[in-house]
Amino acid sequence: MDPTIAAGALIGGGLIMAGGAIGAGIGDGIAGNALIAGIARQPEAQGRLFTPFFITVGLVEAAYFINLAFMALFVFATPVA
């Protein structure tokens, strides 16, 4: 394999993982902030707030794992020159 293609694949894969990790961290932080603010405002609504929070965090983490799959595609399925 051409070293330029391999280097580009590894750099692209690293950028994909970095963007996914940063995005997932920001998304989880925003969701957690909203949960804490909602519980602080209405403590009796804590039970109703946890379900949408966990669904949101699950969707954010699913997007991260989709990024992981694309990274694996770019790094391990690069064309052979």
UniProtKB/Swiss-Prot annotation:
Q: How does it sit in the membrane?
A: Multi-pass membrane protein
> What's one Pfam family the UniProt record gives for this protein?
ATP-synt_C
Task: List residue numbers at the site (Reversibly protonated during proton transport).
Answer: E61
Domain of life where this protein originates: Bacteria
* InterPro entries in the record: ATP_synth_csu_bac/chlpt, ATP_synth_F0_csu, ATP_synth_F0_csu_DDCD_BS, ATP_synth_F0_csu_sf, ATPase_proteolipid_c-like_dom, F/V-ATP_Csub_sf
What the entry lists under Gene3D superfamilies is as follows: F1F0 ATP synthase subunit C (1.20.20.10)
> What are the subcellular locations of this protein?
Cell membrane
What range does the record give for the signal peptide? none
> GO cellular component annotations, sorted alphabetically?
plasma membrane; proton-transporting ATP synthase complex; proton-transporting two-sector ATPase complex, proton-transporting domain
Q: Name one GO molecular function term.
A: proton-transporting ATP synthase activity, rotational mechanism
- Transmembrane feature ranges: 5-25, 57-77
Provide the alphabetized UniProt keywords: ATP synthesis, Cell membrane, CF(0), Hydrogen ion transport, Ion transport, Lipid-binding, Membrane, Transmembrane, Transmembrane helix, Transport
Q: What does this protein do?
A: F(1)F(0) ATP synthase produces ATP from ADP in the presence of a proton or sodium gradient. F-type ATPases consist of two structural domains, F(1) containing the extramembraneous catalytic core and F(0) containing the membrane proton channel, linked together by a central stalk and a peripheral stalk. During catalysis, ATP synthesis in the catalytic domain of F(1) is coupled via a rotary mechanism of the central stalk subunits to proton translocation.
Q: How does it assemble?
A: F-type ATPases have 2 components, F(1) - the catalytic core - and F(0) - the membrane proton channel. F(1) has five subunits: alpha(3), beta(3), gamma(1), delta(1), epsilon(1). F(0) has three main subunits: a(1), b(2) and c(10-14). The alpha and beta chains form an alternating ring which encloses part of the gamma chain. F(1) is attached to F(0) by a central stalk formed by the gamma and epsilon chains, while a peripheral stalk is formed by the delta and b chains.
Q: Which family does it belong to?
A: Belongs to the ATPase C chain family.
What HAMAP family does the entry give?
Answer: ATP_synth_c_bact
Q: What is this protein called?
A: ATP synthase subunit c
This protein's species is Mycobacterium sp. (strain KMS)
